[in-house]
Amino acid sequence: MSLVAASLHVASESALGPACRFTEAHVTEPLAERGVHHCSLSLTHAGQCQVAIRWELCGPVNAPLLIVAGGISATRHVLGNDVDSSEGWWQAQAHFLRRYRVLAIDWLGDGDGIDAPIDSRDQANAIAAVLDALGIAKVRAFVGASYGAMVGLQFAAAHAHRLCAVVAISGAHRSHPWSSALRSIQRKIVELGSLQCAEGHGLALARQLAMLSYRTPKEFSSRFTDPVALEGNRAVCPAESYLEACGQRACARFDAASYRRLSESIDLHSIEPESIRVPLSVIAIDSDQLVPSEDLAELAVRAPDAWLHVISSHYGHDAFLKETSAIGAALNDALDA
């Protein structure tokens, strides 16, 4: 199916208007498309900029449309599909997401040559620009996790007329001061690596430090039970090989500038919950160190029309990737409400 035909069909769903009455799709053969939208965007902290926004659209063509966004490591490839059969970053939620047509983008600043401060609202405006290019007037919901939840909140505030609801998983109206402090150290590690002509080493170490905040002491205590051991004349802790593998994956995924700018973008994020004028479902994790459930409770209290669901997990911030059943059930509740 051509881009125009697919876009017109999705747009026709949005003609239902503010009531947002969508019917479940019964198409068994999903279609997928990828593209790049070139346009000029006014960036919050950097002014007018020519951008190339990489997008992917997949799922049954007559299904309600979701915008889906994850953490800074997430890409436009959410699920394996006809364009790319490899597993997407949220393949674990395939059972839930297959009911919908899914639109996602690669973040501004992710390997596209933009080396300037990027705000979460810039990402929201980039998604709106893609919707314009595809001829899509309105979507069923914006489902965001981690950084993607922050972008979803910005989208809801700036483009409320374009969606019926927003689901924010482990992403609040601001960054917690403890989390911002931790990320500032990570960025300094990356910068130090670059100064020492060891960019990859600095990036890998920064990611290893980040992993400690994504997970929890409880998970580590149950997962890494061996004692610290001497290898030659060096003490090695049982989690080191796991953390080193995480660091190497980050090196394969990011360049230093992209990692630094997207990390900054998390900390630059700020929005008044009162400005979110669409129904908001907030999903918190009780063990999340990066985005404490107290912050998400505040978001839900201050937003005009919000619902809060707290999931118990020992995975911390990464629960949105690991707690498949609990997250899927919460998503069902949010979008069926």
Q: Where in the sequence are the language-model features?
A:
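Conserved hydrolase catalytic core segment
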Residues: 139-177
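Alpha/beta-hydrolase
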Residues: 187-278
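Flexible "cap/lid" loop of the alpha/beta hydrolase fold
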Residues: 167-196
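Catalytic active-site module of serine/aspartate enzymes centered on a nucleophile-bearing elbow/loop
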Residues: 298, 305-337
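Conserved acidic catalytic loop of the alpha/beta-hydrolase fold
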Residues: 121-140
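Conserved alpha/beta-hydrolase "acid-adjacent" motif
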Residues: 289-295
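Conserved strand-to-loop "acid loop" that flanks and positions the catalytic carboxylate
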Residues: 282-287
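N-terminal cap/lid subdomain of alpha/beta-hydrolase-fold enzymes
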Residues: 56-110
